[in-house]
Amino acid sequence: MKLIIEADDFGLSKSITDGIVDGINGGYITSTNIMANMPFAEYAVEKAVENNIKSVGLHFNLTVGKPLTKNPLLTDKNGVFLYNRKQIENPNLTYECVYNEMMAQIKQIEKFGKGKLKLNHITCHHHLGDNAIIKQVVYDITKLLNLPIRRVDYSADFDINKPDLYYKNFSMKNVNIDCLRNFIEEYSNTDLTIELLSHPGYIDDYTKTITSYLDRDKELSTLKQAKEEGLFDKIQLIDYSALK
């Protein structure tokens, strides 16, 4: 097995970002993705450059925070993205408004990186690909940029490089060392390239105001424990650059 340990939500908060950086530097996270519209996106890019983090993707976001483009089709009356299913089921979405926002998020990361950070894959926040318009935009831009993409239901039929398997069970009640141990035992002798989804990070007071998922520190410590116990010694750890 070749394993990408992917950390979602880089830039969502300072503490989450710091936790992901520590995980990458510690060798128990191999890749991450940035939420370009969030207040700590620039901080995340700075930390990626400072720590020479090479595998950074866009975590395309239409459901949390404010858009980078001024388009009321994407937002509520306060200029904030419609949340989760409300956005996915938004009857007012157009190809143009989604395309422009995704490109704006990519350009935001490029601007923050000042030529020192290049995106190497695409993921989406929440289940954006359940919307046909969003799915088409994600396909078109990912194809245009010749980047690999996360393997999820909506992208399974894309003629774009992606992992063979997407493992998302390491979450909530399954955030424990046995979950990781069983996962590695099941797949270690295969030739599959697998992405392990994670949402690691440190938790501070600000983070508690912007996310309901607070097991991030537990995920981080469990991944660290797996590294210390040698669970990853049985497999090959890679990042998204291997899928180019």
Name every feature range the model reports, one short phrase each.
Residues A7-F10:
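DG-centered beta-turn motif at the end of beta-strands
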Residues M1-I4, K14-G57, K66-E96, N100-K116, ...:
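Terminal accessory/targeting
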